[in-house]
Amino acid sequence: MVIHVEVRFLGIFQRLSGKKRFKLKLEEPATVRKLLMKLTETFSSEFKQVLVDSQLGDPRPNALILVGGKEISALQGLETLVKDADEIVLVPMVHGG
């Protein structure tokens, strides 16, 4: 079954995608990992470089990812299931020293 979700981009993710919101179709079972893979295939290589930590191959050092208003680390991480009509929000992390 196909589900429809909406991704909301904040900060640099909005600039790199050129969108505030993006509707996406996914095959069930849909996870955050599958959703992020689809986004990195859809948008520029720069979008992927900013989203995914190159050493870890993981987006979590670079982004807070919310599903239905909850951060995925409080759920099942990248294996969190995404349901039809869910809103996923990508919030960039700022690191400094």
Predicted stretch roles:
Residues 1-96:
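Ubiquitin-like/PB1-type beta-grasp interaction modules and other compact soluble beta-rich domains
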